[in-house]
Curated annotation (Swiss-Prot):
Record text on activity regulation: Uridylyltransferase (UTase) activity is inhibited by glutamine, while glutamine activates uridylyl-removing (UR) activity.
Keywords: Hydrolase, Magnesium, Multifunctional enzyme, Nucleotidyltransferase, Repeat, Transferase
Residue ranges of the region described as Uridylyl-removing: 352-710
Record's protein name: Bifunctional uridylyltransferase/uridylyl-removing enzyme
Cofactor annotation: Mg(2+)
Taxonomic lineage from the root: Bacteria, Pseudomonadati, Pseudomonadota, Gammaproteobacteria, Enterobacterales
Role of this protein: Modifies, by uridylylation and deuridylylation, the PII regulatory proteins (GlnB and homologs), in response to the nitrogen status of the cell that GlnD senses through the glutamine level. Under low glutamine levels, catalyzes the conversion of the PII proteins and UTP to PII-UMP and PPi, while under higher glutamine levels, GlnD hydrolyzes PII-UMP to PII and UMP (deuridylylation). Thus, controls uridylylation state and activity of the PII proteins, and plays an important role in the regulation of nitrogen assimilation and metabolism.
Species annotation: Serratia proteamaculans (strain 568)
Length: 892
């Protein structure tokens, strides 16, 4: 892994002549100590930093150069303001500045240390000193404390204590600074075990804020797991316990090998380079690699490629580096734990077998050469971990030996017959994911086992849809699948919790999950390529033909159910028949729905909501019914209409309604209306229409969730641009439209149903119902259509480009056309689409709206003015008009 990085790193740097560094501040005369002159000097220095970086200077040298420059500036100002005349006072660098690490926008944290409180005149002088630094636009954090205050505040606050531990003298009273150092490194100031525990807890809390992974697609270079803070934590703990001030000194104390020191240096160098570049493209301090910055940073680092390739290559390097930092951090903190807290020497390790023993609840090697001599023993260890619930992790020295052996493997572990048997045995065991596959991934053993896995480690996709890298997403799919075996998951995923225990071979589902995205980033259809990979894997791992074909089908079709449920008209019997023909059996259907739900949930935590759950349940049960009925037997649509009407009538009779009036309303409705609404929906509409003047518009907002969302029913004289007006108003109200059923009865009255959600995926808040109902009523009663005011897209969306694509799906009818639209998500999109339909005199009969990150992938069911499918010329015009209306290059 490290060799691959070094090759990439050298290829992106093209050294030029490094410019001469500007004059140091210690040479400035008194006449230059003013805000204007100093600001010019600082600007020159910042320009030099950027030029030197572009010319190939290392981030390490430039970070040190800025720290040195600021040191000299502060010393010059210290003299200028006469602080040398104040006895027993010192200026001390703390934080990152204390470590001598100042990136272009890093804060400059200083401590004005004194033996006793400063008097009013001295305090005023300090204030003038700090004010000048602020006027120079330096981000200065400062504190003014006596020695006693430093110690008291340090004892009370871990952050203050950490700053003091890495403090560095700039100028002033050296004896006072050394006195402070003596106190903070004494046994009474944050004893080593206490400091260690506090820093570990602090790190755990920080990791939790980032969902426990560095694989978020907009990571914080400093604070995300595996980032620079994880290296700092190691340095802080070593500094407090051993007095070590560098990684080199940690090697001297025997708690870091030369190879580990080199690896941490390599990781830090890479992270510094990215952070330095980020600071050069930002106007103010920030360490987050947000989407809108990633391309600029990648270009500054000279990553090459078409489109998003530079970003994806840079981020792949980044994620691989943070993986390595994370593994080293975890292992070394364990080693510190052993050194600092010293496990009870009287507690002897308990043998598990000839090769492994248990130290507390951690598995440990009995012979440190075992992994090198017998690589298959690596798999034996993970097999023991999945079988023995006492084992909670791997002992630190064993992790060290595992890392060493991993780097010396001559061939993938899957080429060893015993390793293959053990891998399949692991998959078949309950708890395989949490107790074996997750730690195997954490320690890069999955990569060592199957080379294909290495290709997706750190593989990101530059979009707003996928929240994690491909490997992290896959691990989360596996974890979600395993959770379906837990009854506690039932409230969130009732169908999957019911089906998962009924799967005859759940290990096949885990195998499909492992391979479902394995071919991403290779080019071509990743589903087909992944299916080919898993067939080869199945053959060498001894799966029979039936098992191999099932897993390959799941990989090839892992998107089928999601696409069908969210982007097809699943109330159309033909769609259900086509889907059922592909699925073929109830067993395959059960496997597929579990994989689909896990895949959606693991793609982005915000994607799963009650709407998607209802769609998948509806598709599952409709398919199950079709499979049980037999593929040759189509549902009787007339019988379904009759059944829906009778059930709705039964509900309405409980309200003593006027059945003659009801018959008059229903007699004017076409069959599609009854087919596409449930009896409860039909009764709800009728109940309000019977109590309403049917010549006037009506807007209803359901109080109960319908298919996971809020149903809005609109009754209004049909007219051009009605859909556009409704969609525009919903957009103004920040409603997310997910489904629309558009009907016009025989009297020309529109009977339109919309399923809407709040932006967070929840049903519409009750306190918004009245305002939205009134707003929609006003929108549909306006005499002339008023196009919605064009709003700017969100800042995130502005950095993505999605070409507008229009296609027409094959259809079984000559009465409807099915249009599939892909475009950049943008404010007012549905209203603009509706305007185009109205301009071309097309009638909309239904819509299924899917927003996938920055993309919309929508389905519209259309007919022309003669209630027929669109002819080729109309299709051509429609495609042209939609492309013009939605082209992301248009000004908005």
């Amino acid at each position: 892994m490290s060799e691959n990085f070094r090759q990439q790193d050298t290829s992106v740097i093209s050294p030029q002549a490094v410019p001469v560094q500007p004059e140091y501040p210690n040479a400035y005369g008194d006449e230059e100590i003013n805000c204007i002159a100093l600001k010019q000097r600082l600007e020159q220095f910042q320009l030099w930093l950027a030029a030197a970086f572009n010319a190939g200077s290392s981030a390490e040298s430039l970070v040190a150069a800025r720290s040195d420059f600021i040191d000299r500036l502060l010393r010059r100002l210290w003299v200028f303001y006469g602080f040398e005349d104040i006895p027993e006072t010192a200026l001390v660098a703390v934080g990152g500045y204390g470590r001598g690490e100042l990136h272009p926008l890093s804060d400059i944290d200083v401590l004005v240390l004194s033996q006793r409180r400063l008097n009013e005149q001295q305090s005023q002088r300090v204030g003038e000193f700090i004010t000048l630094l602020w006027d120079l636009k330096l981000e200065v954090g400062h504190s003014v404390r006596t020695l006693e205050e430093c110690l008291l505040e340090g004892l009370a606050d871990l952050t203050v204590a950490t700053n003091l531990i890495e403090s560095r003298m700039i100028c002033g009273d050296v004896a006072l600074f050394l006195q402070m150092q003596k106190h903070i490194f004494s046994d009474g100031f944050w004893p080593s075990p206490q400091f260690f525990h506090a820093k570990v807890v602090e790190q755990q809390e920080r990791h939790q804020r980032y969902h426990g992974t560095s694989y978020n697609l907009e990571p914080d270079i400093k604070s995300s797991p595996g980032g620079l803070r994880d290296i700092h934590t190691l340095l802080w703990v070593a500094r407090r316990h051993f007095g070590a001030t560098s990684l080199d000194e940690m090697v001297g104390f025997g708690f870091l090998t030369q190879a580990e020191r080199n690896e941490l240096n390599e990781c830090q160098s890479f992270l510094w380079r990215i952070r330095f570049a980020l600071h050069l493209v930002l106007p103010r301090y920030d360490n987050r690699l947000l989407f809108d910055r990633q391309l600029n940073v990648a270009q500054l680092l000279r990553y090459e490629g078409e489109g998003n390739e530079p970003v994806e290559r840079m981020m792949k390097d980044f994620y691989r580096m943070t993986r390595r930092v994370g593994e080293l951090n975890h292992m070394l903190l364990q080693l510190f734990d052993e050194a600092i807290l010293a496990l009870d020497a009287t507690e002897k390790p308990r043998p598990l077998n000839d090769d492994f023993q248990l130290r507390g609840d951690l598995i440990d090697l009995r012979d440190e050469t075992l992994f090198i001599r017998q690589p298959e023993s690596i798999m034996r260890m993970f097999y023991l971990m999945v079988r023995n619930r006492e084992i909670k992790g791997i002992y630190s020295t064993t992790v060290r030996q595992l890392r060493h052996a991993r780097r010396h493997l001559k061939q993938p572990l899957c080429t060893i017959p015993e390793a293959r048997e053990l891998f399949m045995a692991i998959l078949r065991h309950p708890g395989a994911v949490s107790r074996a596959l997750v730690p195997m991934h954490r320690h890069s053993v999955l990569w060592a086992y199957m080379p294909q896995w290495g290709k997706i480690v750190g593989q990101m996709q530059f979009d707003l849809f996928h929240a994690y890298t491909v490997d992290e997403h896959t691990i989360r799919v596996l974890q979600k699948l395993e959770s379906f075996a837990d009854a506690e998951t039932r409230p969130r995923h009732p169908l999957c919790v019911e089906l998962y225990p009924r799967l005859p071979n759940p290990e096949l589902l885990l195998l499909a999950a492992l391979f479902h995205d394995i071919a991403k980033g290779r080019g071509g259809d990743h589903s087909i390529l992944g299916a080919q990979d898993v067939l080869e894997f199945a053959e060498v791992h001894g799966l029979n033909s039936r098992e191999a074909q099932l897993v390959a089908w799941l990989v090839r079709c892992h998107l089928l159910m999601s696409v069908t449920a969210q982007r097809r008209d699943i109330q159309d019997p033909t769609v259900i028949q086509q889907f059922s023909a592909e699925v073929q059996s109830e067993t395959r259907l059960r496997y597929l729905v579990c994989l689909t739900v896990a895949d959606i949930c693991a793609t982005n935590e915000t994607l799963w909501n009650s709407w998607k759950q209802s769609l998948l349940r509806e598709l599952y049960f409709a398919t199950e019914k079709q499979l049980r009925r037999g593929m040759q037997n189509s549902p009787d649509l007339r019988e379904r209409v009759r059944h829906h009407r009778l059930q709705a009538l039964a509900l309405l009779r409980m309200d003593n309604i006027d059945e003659e009036a009801l018959h008059r309303i229903w007699s004017r409705c076409r069959a599609d209306y009854f087919l596409r609404h449930s009896p409860n929906q039909l009764a709800w509409h009728a109940r309000h229409l019977l109590a309403h003047d049917s010549t006037k518009p009506l807007v209803l907002v359901s109080r109960q969730a319908t298919r996971g969302g809020t149903e809005i029913f609109i009754w209004s004289p049909d007219r051009p641009y009605l859909f556009a007006a409704v969609a525009g108003e919903m957009d103004r109200r920040n409603l997310s439209v997910h489904d629309a059923q558009i009907f016009t009865n025989r009297d020309g009255m529109a009977m339109d149903t919309f399923i809407v959600l709040e932006p967070d995926g929840s049903p519409l808040a009750q306190d918004r119902h009245t305002a939205i109902r009134h707003a929609l009523l006003q929108a549909i009663t306006q005499r002339e259509y008023q196009p919605p005011r064009v709003r700017r897209p969100s800042s995130k969306l502005r950095h993505f480009s999605v070409p507008t694509e229009v296609s027409f799906l094959p259809t079984h009818t000559d009465r409807r056309s099915y249009l599939e639209l892909t475009a950049l998500d943008q404010p007012g999109l549905l209203a603009r689409v509706g305007e185009v339909f109205a301009d071309l005199n097309l009638s909309l009969h239904g819509a299924r709206i899917s927003t996938i990150g920055e993309r919309v992938e929508d389905l519209f069911i259309l007919a022309d003015s003669d209630r027929r499918a669109l002819n080729p010329e109309t299709r051509r015009k429609l495609e042209q008009r939609l492309t013009e209306a939605l082209n992301p290059n248009d000004k908005m």
